[in-house]
A protein has these predicted regions:
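Catalytic Walker B motif of ABC-type/P-loop ATPase nucleotide-binding domains
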Residues: 96-100
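Helix N-cap at the start of a conserved alpha-helix in ABC-type nucleotide-binding domains
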Residues: 107-108
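H-loop (His-switch) and adjacent beta-strand-loop-beta switch element
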Residues: 131-132, 138-155
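ABC nucleotide-binding domain signature
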Residues: 9, 13-20, 127
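Conserved catalytic loops of ABC-family nucleotide-binding domains
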Residues: 118-130, 136
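ABC ATPase nucleotide-binding domain helical subdomain, centered on the C-loop/LSGGQ "ABC signature"
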Residues: 30-70, 114-115, 123
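A short, proline-enriched helix->beta-strand linker immediately N-terminal to the Walker B motif
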Residues: 90-94, 123
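ABC ATPase nucleotide-binding domain "signature" region
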Residues: 76-77, 83-88, 128
Length: 161
């Protein structure tokens, strides 16, 4: 596997990992999303709306300062997944690795997340591990991995089947 024409094992990876298992810190929504970076609230609101979380956000008692996590407001798995994607976008690296990023989302939410990946990461490199057809459509190369090894590259025809 090559990144910028170098073997992946020889490249120091500066990447964002967006997992299907989301851990939120016992911190505010803002702190969970920004991880210490100064991000304008306007940008955060834009991403929350695009991810379909505007209604949820509007009901938070303290807005972006509302504490979430084990000691705060409890979130559904789907809400956590969408916040995790927003966090990944805000981290802003060149390489992204997604592990089933829409596994707990309904079709409408998956569509929103797919649109966000397409919009915000269009000039980035990303790898998506998924079984979902919609996410597969974002990728220009498709591989089957079996027993921890890359078995084959798939053609567009076999992806659709």
């Amino acid at each position: 596997l090559l990144i910028d024409n170098k073997e992946i094992k020889d490249v120091r990876l500066d990447l964002v990992f967006v997992s299907q298992e989301v851990d939120l810190f016992d911190l505010s929504v803002r702190d969970n999303l920004c991880l210490g970076k100064e991000i304008p609230d306007k940008k955060i609101f834009e991403l929350l709306e695009e991810a379909g979380l505007k209604g949820w956000y509007n009901e938070l008692p303290n807005g972006l300062d509302t504490i979430v996590g084990e000691r705060g407001i409890k979130l559904s798995t789907g809400q956590k997944q969408r916040l995790n994607l927003i966090r990944g976008i805000l981290i802003d690296k060149e390489l992204y690795f997604f592990d089933e990023p829409t596994s707990n989302l309904d079709i409408l939410s998956e569509e929103k997340i797919t649109n966000m990946i397409e919009k915000y990461l269009k000039d980035k490199t990303y790898v998506i591990v998924t079984h979902r057809q919609k996410l597969k459509s974002l990728c220009n190369k498709h591989y089957i991995f079996e027993n921890h090894e890359m078995r084959e590259e798939l053609s567009e025809t076999s992806i659709l089947n």
